[in-house]
Amino acid sequence: MKVLILACLVALALARELEELNVPGEIVESLSSSEESITHINKKIEKFQSEEQQQMEDELQDKIHPFAQTQSLVYPFPGPIPKSLPQNIPPLTQTPVVVPPFLQPEIMGVSKVKEAMAPKHKEMPFPKYPVEPFTESQSLTLTDVENLHLPLPLLQSWMHQPPQPLPPTVMFPPQSVLSLSQSKVLPVPQKAVPYPQRDMPIQAFLLYQEPVLGPVRGPFPIIV
């Protein structure tokens, strides 16, 4: 009897242990099934979100397309556009475009810089010496003396006066011109003219004078 009771007790204990072992297995199965359901639900949620996003994009494209169609070119005539132009149309004359030669600001700036860097050399002018016009001395010729018809005493007093040479004009030529003029000057032949005496008549004095064809350019002193 004791053996049977012990066997029953052992069997009960084993049965309890088996039940305890079966409970975690069910829990594991339930957990695994719950995880699968969670993943399935997540997949459904993602699919739903992707469908919503795709629907929103389609709606935006539908809104953009009619706006682009309204902006398209509208031709006034319903017929097709001819690809080739008719031959009767004369060719268009192209008017030549005239560009004024304006300097660009960059080029102007470069030219100004060049002028500032390399200034032009100013040539010094040669000094101009004052040149006085040559004054011809108004000398009386034989015809002038005859045409004067002066009285005899006045003419004698004028004849007795010794000739006074005029003061020479003051010139300041360069040294080179002065040297050339001095080297090329020829000696003037001096003729001895007899000085008229007081008792000599005018007609005798006029015989000694040579006829002068033109005005004398320079006063020459009379050498006695």
UniProtKB/Swiss-Prot annotation:
The gene is CSN2. Belongs to the beta-casein family. The modification Phosphoserine is found at S30, S32, S33, S34. It comes from the Eukaryota. One of its GO terms (cellular component) is extracellular space. This is Beta-casein. Residues 1-15 form the signal peptide. InterPro entries: Casein (IPR001588), Casein_beta (IPR016345), Casein_CS (IPR031305). The keyword Secreted applies. It comes from Bubalus bubalis (Domestic water buffalo).
